[in-house]
Design a protein with these regions (language model features):
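Non-catalytic accessory regions flanking glycosidase/transglycosidase catalytic cores in CAZymes
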Residues: 1-223, 229-237, 261-262, 266-303, ...
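Active-site His/acidic residue clusters
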Residues: 241-257
């Protein structure tokens, strides 16, 4: 089967905001405790954070991490997480029905973030709390000094402000499961007033307002419209959340789910632009897709979990090869929409629906989904080139005209590198792939990488990381175009030196 991608040097979708490759750490399960933080581990640093985990986070090259939630934040009292550790209270976390020790808080997480070269995307509690508490947290984190909260930060050991620049106004407030769930009208009013107050404290921050927690929510669409009508002038981004799964074991349908993500994004963009026109505004609201991933493997295990434990193993999906293929498709979809999606957070980062897994007192290991994310985060920099794709397609329940080839190309002018990311969705046929371009001169193929040939249900484990990429040498360059073969059910990365 033949397939083709064409690009032109000067036809671009957008520059890539590096925050597109963000992630998420929530006080949930073993994400924090026995995840990034395990003071008794042999690799633990002076603060108690595992150096082996830090190394894997650095490999992923994550520029931004959302924190501390998630559902958790809607019951969070941030003051419990600062000051001497021995004085911090243990509290019940109603979101996940566990016990929170508060041994990791604002200061510790900020230090960890600095160690792994990432920025903190801080969330405020608009479930059980409100404007005053959000202002005080921002003052504590970002104000230079000379006030009660900023001086308290100094007393707690941090002289200079943390300088967190991106803030989330609550989490999934449309969800009936959320502590302090609100209607769009209620949340829109609260978010607007909170945003106004926060920007009076620090006008350099950017704010993310809650969109729908899923495109399947009965209030989807109306929620976005009403919330934006209240907040449009005061916020910078609208959030989207979406998780995918394959409980019915329909691979063709599963690998087509990236089309659902694409439609979700385009629908939300339309709503943003409708409100812009309605308000007669010159301002453009962009998107923060700050929760996305595969999530369904652990549902049964989680339902049987005993409540009120400290750091129980919750949401520990073990990902397989087909999950890695879908993650590749979803990453390509985010790049295709990078003109409006400026922030995205793979949810989550460690142990909880995560690319990185740890054993208590033991090893770390990489899940199958680690690799596509690592490839795109490290090599998908610069600009996204507008794609023209020729590919046969298939139809499956819920989706018509699903292309066998899912692909995009990026160009990084700093290092003269053109990178092709491609998934072959076909379960049986190799794609004879041709890459045509205008405006570049090929110098050499830097590297061709593929994840291919695995059973779709194959997984990794601490004892054996079986599903991982290999260096291949199938691509050839002639007449300033590239040809290669993309194996059935494969994730492919081709890096080309150009001038």
């Amino acid at each position: 089967m033949k397939a083709k991608l064409r690009v032109q040097r000067h036809q671009k979708i957008s520059e890539i905001d590096e925050r597109l490759y963000g992630s998420f750490i929530e006080h949930l399960g073993r994400a924090v405790y026995n995840g990034i933080y395990e003071p008794t581990h042999e690799t633990a640093d002076a603060e108690g954070f595992r150096n082996d985990v830090k190394q894997l986070v650095k490999e992923l090259n994550v520029p931004l991490v959302r924190y501390p939630g998630g559902n958790f934040v809607s019951g969070y009292k941030w003051e419990d997480s600062v000051g001497p550790k021995e004085n911090r209270p243990r509290k019940v976390d109603l979101a996940w029905r566990t016990i929170e020790t508060n041994q990791v808080g604002v200061h510790e997480f900020a230090k960890w973030a600095k160690e792994v070269d990432t920025e903190v995307n801080m969330a405020v509690n608009l479930g059980t709390r409100g404007i005053q508490e959000a202002m005080e947290l921002l003052e504590y984190c970002n104000f230079e000094g000379g006030t009660y909260w900023s001086d308290l930060r100094k007393e707690h050991g941090t002289e200079k402000p943390f300088g967190f620049k991106t803030w989330c106004l609550g989490n999934e407030m449309d969800g009936p499961w959320q502590i302090g769930h609100k209607t769009a009208e209620e949340y829109g009013r609260l978010a607007a007033e909170t945003a106004k107050a926060m920007k009076l404290v620090d006008d350099s921050i950017e704010l993310v307002v809650c969109g729908s927690s899923s495109s399947k929510m009965p209030t989807f669409g109306d929620w976005e419209r009403v919330v934006l009508e209240h907040t449009y002038e005061y916020v910078d981004y609208l959030s989207l959340h979406c998780y995918y799964g394959n409980p019915e074991n329909n691979l063709g349908n599963y690998l087509a789910q990236s089309l659902d993500m694409d439609q979700f994004i385009k629908t939300v963009v339309s709503i943003c632009d409708y409100v812009k026109v309605k308000k007669g505004s010159d301002k453009q609201i962009n998107l923060s897709f700050d929760e996305w991933n595969v999530w369904y493997h652990s549902n049964e295990q989680d339902a049987a979990m005993e409540p009120w434990q400290i750091a129980p193993p919750l949401l520990e999906d073990i990902y397989n090869f087909e999950d890695a293929l879908l993650i590749g498709c979803l990453l390509i979809t985010l790049l295709k929409n990078s003109d409006r999606v400026k922030i995205a957070c793979l949810a989550q980062l460690v142990n909880v629906i995560a690319p990185i897994m740890t054993e208590n007192d033991g090893e770390t290991w990489k899940q199958t989904i680690f690799y596509p994310f690592m490839h795109v985060s490290n090599h998908g920099r610069g600009v996204v080139l507008t794609p023209s794709v020729e590919s046969d397609s298939y139809s499956v329940e819920g989706f018509k005209h699903v292309p066998y080839l899912e692909t995009i190309a990026t160009y990084n002018e700093e290092n003269n590198e053109l990178v092709i990311f491609a998934v072959n969705r076909s379960q049986e046929e190799t794609l004879e792939f041709v890459f045509e371009q205008e405006g570049f001169e090929f110098e050499s193929i830097i590297e061709e990488t593929a994840m291919e040939g695995f059973d779709v249900k194959a997984t990794n484990a601490a004892a054996a990381e079986v599903v991982k990429p290999s260096i291949v040498q199938k691509a050839t360059i002639a007449d300033n175009q590239l040809t290669t073969s993309l194996s059935p059910l494969s994730w492919n990365v081709i890096r080309i030196k150009v001038k």
